[in-house]
């Protein structure tokens, strides 16, 4: 599957008091808007290499870290060790924010559904450095000229409309934002 949640043993829903994203692009802007609706704080670590130190500095808060599974890599181990030892931490790793949007079904596009089933059949690793870049290119291409026109740097307000927003949040099983 293209997302993972830690601690993976968790049977209860994760109810964070705060969300931390790794960067300040569209994904952060999306979760920041969601957090505001629920009177929660959303912070950005301004880069995956800062996630660990942020968590060390905020040790008493219930934090959900949302980071791109595709790009998290080596930083992951240190953060995972923290998550294993602290009950107030959870880690949600979708492949990327763009993957989350694509898999939400809001685009109702059969080609996207096929690609999400077996992405490795479609991704040319010579052309795309990472899955994240591929999914970003796909989302950008599929939404160009539509009301959901996507750019990585700035979130289109259309993604915060109830139907769209709820479809995206609906992908995040076990995460409860109240």
Regions found by a protein language model. Name each.
Residues 19-23, 40-44, 86, 90, ...:
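Generic alpha-helical structural element
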Residues 34-35, 80-83, 172, 176:
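Hydrophobic, Leu/Ile/Phe/Ala-enriched alpha-helical segments that form helix-helix packing faces
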Residues 1-77:
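RecA-like P-loop NTPase motor core
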Residues 36-37, 53, 81, 114, ...:
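Polar/charged alpha-helical tracts
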Residues 3-6, 28, 38, 52-54, ...:
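Sequence-level detector for tyrosine residue identity
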Residues 66-145:
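Activity-critical C-terminal alpha-helical subdomain
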Residues 120-178:
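Charge-biased C-terminal accessory regions appended to nucleic-acid-, cytoskeletal NTPase
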